[in-house]
Amino acid sequence: MLFSLKISFLMMGLSGLTAQIVLLRELLVSFLGNELTLGIILANWLILVAIGSYLIGPSVERVERKLEVFVLLQLVFSVALPLSIFLCRTFKNILLLTPGEALGFAPIWVSSFLILLPVTLPYGALFTYGCKLYSQYSREEASSVGKVYLFETIGAIIGGLLLTFLLIQHLHSFEIALVISLAMGWVSLILVWPALNQRGSGPASRSLIPSFKSALWILSGLLCLIFAYSLLSQTSTLIHHFSLQTQWRNLNVIHNENSAYGNITVTKRGEQFTFYNDGVPSLTAPVPDIAFVENFVHFPMLFHEKPESLLILSGGAGGMIHEILKYPIKRVDYVELDPLLLKLVQKFPTPLTQSELSDKRVNIHYMDGRLYTQKTQDRFDILWIGLPAPQTLQTNRLFSLEFFFMAKRIMNPHGLLVLSLPGSLTYISPELRDLNGCILDTLKRVFASVRIIPGDVNLYLASSSEFLEKIPSDEIVTRFKERNIQTNLLTENYLKYRLQERWLQWYWKSMERRKSHINSDFLPLGVYFNLSYWNALFSPYLTGIFKGFEGLQLTLFLVIIILITVLLAILFIKMPRHSRHAVTYSIFTTGLTGMIFTLAIIFTFQTFYGYLYHQIGLLVAIFMAGIAFGSYLIIHPLNRMKEHSILYLKIEIGIILFAILLPFFFLIPSPHLENKTVFFVLYAGFLVTAFLSGMFTGLQFPLAVKIYLKQPSEKWKLGQTAGLIYGADLFGGFFGGLFGGVLFLPLLGLKKTCFMMAMIKISSGLLFLLFMRSKRT
């Protein structure tokens, strides 16, 4: 039975990590790819697991048939996982939302909470029941918690590696879920079988009453048959297509595929194709958005005296290139953020896209746009950023201060950088003002001249030459007549109307702000302001909260940390018996800092490389490997160790040093990513930092349980202690995910956030010192 339990714990970790990543990927598509929502999703995952651990887990001390409940929880998890994936794709229909519609903060939090609930509640209880069962069969107490933690973590590592390098490459989400569910059902059969055949008075025979153990075994076998049939009969594929069609209501989905950069869906209505990238429309053909395309292309072309060499970063196919080729240019280099999009455009051709991509002047590059900008030695007259706004960290890579410097390097002396942002000619809301102002301030930091053409879509033209602001509107109209370009919308009168001085004066008056904001790789304010803008549209009742967050400073958080530390210190000094809660507080802060470190590593990886969608499973698996390594190091000498508290304090100091050094590890090599050696060494560095971040958690968790159980005044049992410490870790991760992704990292930036984490661990270290002192007195 002990061997079967170990297999079960491995499967528990594997299935938990796999479920988490698959659901994360599905929810990211529903939330339009915004990585800041990762923190909200992870926070909900952790709080629900903690609730399961706290509410269901403590019943382990009262329930006689522990193995029975453990197996039932596994079966509930296996059934809930495919259901949750289906809900990820269809919940917008339930809420009467349209495909591609953005959500505010509150709907994102509530919907992800409810979708994850069926999976996470049983998963949270499995750990507590697993600890008790292992101690029951192994006759061990404190070390059993660490061993279950270790087996679960090893399973999570295996799951992350399998998911990243095998499952995602060949299976869709429902197939992955059914494979996991089948494995969980198989493990349930293994656990029930010994109890089914055993007679006597051992734990196995007592744990299951005869009538129920037979029914449980039959249920496990029946579910295994259902899962296996669904996989082998292609029922899973039918469910997959049905869920996609339901997700894209009233649209004919003809293709859906995941790439390293995200999810791309192609729909068709009549002869019109629409390509969606993570739920956001990227291009339409053969009839494009004529108004946007003509404005976005022709204004920059007319502002340049003689454009010949051009670069398009995303959004070129489906109209832009067609309009550009009306001019006597020499070459157009076209790069997409996701190369799969170009391949699908060629797979589903239209006369428009075929003529664009087959022209000899068009050079297509199947690589990441930012990486191309770093590596190319060519120079360009006009560079277009064909993305609507920095709504994700992936797109923010082309709107940051660092990227603008890269773009400036490859522009000719009178070259133009062109981008667009949401605008209005009637009313600019505070959120829209902040979004536009942030990108404008960033452009001005790099370029000598920035020309704005206000409208429902604001056009920004930036150049290192001051000639741009001196070009009169009459000159633009003259060039339009001389070049004799045939357009559908643009006319001489339209050009005069758009370039009237009154629009520019109105724009500058509407954009008056007290503070300048710079959008950078490590301080992605553009993403935050874009999230705030969408939140104002879809959750306006939270607008005041978002505006309040913008004014938060590191000093305020430091004051709060000091205040909490002082209050807890007074409590522990006045009431020494409560000082044991310093251990709980410490584990809470370790969970919080661990989540912040994980988000920092994930966000920075996305900023540098752009393909987090594919690699997130690997990064989380390496984090879990660190936990496993830390647990392994500490478990074996745990019972022989005498000075548990001193070692625990040393680990606290290690976390503090890690928090201080982490940002510099990323900041120092970041300007040199075009170098292949730096590129791959830094990639390995991400894996190392993820490993170290997990290792600190793995070292502390078993120690915390041991220290807590050693307290003579405590009468807590193993299951209660495991639930308490595990729950504290998860609650810390919850707060880290909730505030780290949408508050700390976007508003404070990487350096200040990591410094704040160091201060939090200094706080927990000082309180733990008080706990050590109280034990000696």
Label each PLM-derived region with a short phrase:
Residues 1-469, 473-777:
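Alpha-helical transmembrane segments of multi-pass membrane proteins
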